[in-house]
Amino acid sequence: AELSFITSAPATSTQNPNERIIFKRLEKQTNVHIDWTCFVADQFSDKKNLALAQFGNLPDGLFNAGMSDYDLLRYAKQGIIIPLENLIDKYMPNLQAVFEKYPEYRTMCTAPDGHIYSFPWIEQLGAGKEAIQAIGDIPYINKKWLDYLGLDIPTTTDELEQVLIAFRDHADDLKKQFDIEGDVIPMSFIINNGDQDPAILINGFGEGYGDTGDHFAVKDDGTVIYTTVQEGYKEGIEWLHKLVTEDLVDPEAFTQEWSTYVAKGKNHRYGLCFTWDIANIDNNTDYVMLPALTGPEGARNITRQNNSETSGFDRGRCVLTSSCRNTALAAAWIDQMYAPLQSPQNNWGSYGEKDSFNIFELSTNKDGGEMLKHLDLGDQSPVEVREAQSVNGPLAVLNEYYDMYVTQPADAKWRLDNMHETYLKDMKSKYVYPNVFMSIDDTNKVSQYDTDIKKYAEQKKADWILNG
C-alpha cells in the first residue's frame, strides 16, 4: 500500500524522509510505503501554500503541516482538507486513548463548527505552573564570572545593573582569566525573538505583567490585557534603555541572527543571555538561572507563557486532503505515530542506528517492558542531534509515559528542576491566555489586527530600548 505526504525537514539534515531510520522501521512494521515531498523547513510555508493551490494534484496529507487556525478553517471551507473526527473514532485507538485521558485536547482540536480538521502534536513535561513551557525566555547569568569577581547572584533590577557594570569594568580581567576570544559582552539577547527576548527582566516594574511573546496577559479577575500599554512595561523599557546607554548591552542584540548569537556564546563571551536552554548557546556548568528580579517598588513576579497550562500543543500539525482515497489506511498509519513507544522517537530521535548519533538506547522499565532510555549526549548539542533523526509530525508524549515508555530528556529534566527551584514561588498570576479556537471571521479579524499591532509594538519596543 502507498500514501503520499508533504513534510518539512531542517536544512542541516537529510531531505529524503525515507532515509530516516524511523520511517524505514515504520515501513517494515506497517507495510505502507510513503511517497514524500519534502521542503526545507525555512521555506516550508511558501512552498506548502503553492502545493495546496494545485487542487487536482494534492497529496494524501501533510505530515508536518504547520497550519494556523486560519489555515485549517480556510482550507476546510475550500474543501482542500477533510474532517477527521469519524476516522479518529473508527481507526485511531492510540489517539482516542489520549483524548480519553485528557478530554481537553479533543476540545482544543475541535473547530467552532464541531469538526476536527487536524491531528495534534502534544508534548507534556510537567503541568500547570510546573509545565516546562511555563517560561521560554530564561535569563542565564555567568556564575563563573560572578564568583571570580566575588559577587552574589542579583535579586533586584538595581543589583543586576551593578553586576553588569562590574562585568563591563572588569572586562580585561575576565578576558585574561578565562582566556576569552573577542570582547566581553555583559548582556546579549535577540530582541522580539521568542525565548531570546529579554522581557522577563522587566516583570518587577509597575503592575508586574512585564511582557509576553504575544503581548497578552490575564489579570486574576479574568480580564485580558495588552502588555505593551501598561505603565510597568513603559518603565521597564526605559530601564532597559538605560542599560544600553551604559554600554552593558551587545550592540548586535537588535539585529543578530541565531547563528551569530550562538557563535559568541560558544566563545564564552556572555555575562547574561536569554534562551530556552543555555546548553544550545554555551554550557550549563558556567551559568545559572537568574531569579525573578524585584523591581524599584518592590514588585516581583514571573508572567507565564500563554497556552502553557496545557503543556506543549500544536493544533494544526497534520492534515488529510480531499484527494486522499484510502482515508482508513491514512488514519490507521497516522495512529501509529501516537503509540506510546513511537511518539517519543518521532519527537526526539531513535535508537540502534549504526554510524549515527542515537538519542536513545532500547532498555526496559521496572516492570520489564520496553522503554526508550536517553543516552548521554556528551558535548553534542541536543538540538543538532535531534534534527538528525527526529521526524516531528503528529504525536503525543504524556506525563504518564516517563519512566514507563521513555526517560525524561536530561536537558529537560535539568531545566524543569532548576525552573521549579528558581521561579515557581514567583509565578503569581492565576491564569494564562489559553489556546482558543475561534470562528474563521474572528480568527481572520484577530490575525489582521494582531499582525499589524504586534509588528508596530515590537518595532517600537526595539526602537525605545535602543534609542530611548
Regions found by a protein language model. Give the residues of each.
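Conserved N-terminal structural module of periplasmic/extracytoplasmic solute-binding proteins
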Residues: 1-159, 171, 198, 210-216, ...
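Extracytoplasmic/periplasmic substrate-binding proteins
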Residues: 9-18, 125-140, 147-153, 190-246, ...
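General small-molecule cofactor/ligand-binding pocket signal
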Residues: 33-39, 251-252, 288-290
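Short beta-strand and adjacent tight-turn residues that come in two discontinuous sequence segments
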Residues: 39, 63-64, 254, 273-276
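Carboxylate/His-rich catalytic cores and anion/metal-binding grooves
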Residues: 79-109, 164-168, 178-217, 264, ...
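Helix-loop-helix "hinge/cap" segment bordering the ligand-binding cleft or interdomain interface
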Residues: 85, 89, 112-196, 218-264, ...
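Polar, glycine-rich mid-to-C-terminal structural blocks
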Residues: 285-294, 303-375
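Conserved small-residue motifs centered on glycine
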Residues: 340-460
